[in-house]
């Protein structure tokens, strides 16, 4: 079955405060998103439970988002969502999507150090956004990088971005496909080398993949 015939799963992943939403906003205008169910717990909390920042609404929205994702998997409907990618449940979902024949695109956004992420989350809170405790930010940062190394073997296409510099466009570092590097764009930041070190090297036969 060709890519065009498969249901699509588009995942924008990265630690809290890495800048996932900026990548998502760009993707929402791309043809890859055509026909995708965009699963956003913040929108669900706001639209179905009245407040995107209230603890109870956030909890209920997370469960509702999981239900929608599972429904798309069963019905083989294309979908897209953001995730910190720091918990086993998302890994399990991605594995099951792979087994169900979904074409998976992973967009991973990282930074040089979790202190960057913590500062951005603090700024977000000052502007009325939701908070994440610093110990969680640091713990999730490490887990997220580790899980990206695994998901890069499951995904048909993986795109890894560095977003360490505030108020600058995220920089595409490399692309991969099913565990193999496809193209490297200049120098790779040390945090991202933790991922590339677990991938197969670039093959001349794969450079046409996008």
Provide a role label for each language-model segment.
Residues 11-14:
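The Walker A (P-loop) glycine that initiates the GxxxxGKT/S ATP-binding motif of P-loop NTPases
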Residues 150-210:
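NTP-dependent small-molecule kinase module
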Residues 20:
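Conserved lysine of the Walker
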Residues 1-7, 72-73:
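Phosphate-binding P-loop
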Residues 100-149:
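A glycine- and Lys/Arg-enriched "phosphate-lid" helix/loop adjacent to the NTP-binding pocket
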Residues 24-77:
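Conserved substrate/cofactor phosphate-moiety recognition/catalytic segment
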Residues 60-109, 144, 159:
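Glycine-rich phosphate-binding loop used to anchor ATP phosphates in small-molecule kinases
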Residues 17:
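Walker A (P-loop) phosphate-binding loop of P-loop NTPases
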């Amino acid at each position: 079955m060709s890519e065009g015939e498969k249901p699509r799963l588009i995942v924008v992943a990265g630690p809290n405060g890495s800048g996932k939403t900026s990548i998502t906003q760009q993707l929402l205008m791309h043809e890859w998103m055509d026909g995708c169910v965009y699963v956003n717990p913040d929108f669900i909390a706001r639209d179905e439970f009245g407040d995107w920042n209230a603890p109870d609404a956030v909890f209920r929205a997370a469960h509702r988002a999981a239900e929608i994702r599972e429904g798309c998997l069963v019905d083989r409907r294309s979908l897209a969502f953001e995730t910190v990618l720091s918990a086993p449940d998302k890994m399990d979902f991605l594995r099951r999507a792979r087994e169900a024949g979904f074409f998976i695109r992973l967009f991973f956004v990282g930074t040089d150090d979790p202190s960057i992420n913590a500062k951005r989350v603090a700024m977000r809170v000052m502007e009325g956004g939701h908070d994440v405790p610093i110990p969680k930010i640091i713990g999730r940062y490490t887990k997220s990088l580790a899980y990206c190394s695994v998901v890069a073997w499951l995904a048909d296409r993986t795109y890894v971005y560095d977003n360490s510099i505030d108020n600058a466009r995220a920089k595409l570092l490399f692309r991969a496909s099913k565990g193999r590097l496809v193209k490297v764009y200049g120098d790779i930041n040390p945090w991202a080398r933790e991922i590339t070190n677990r991938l197969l090297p670039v093959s001349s036969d794969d450079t046409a993949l996008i």
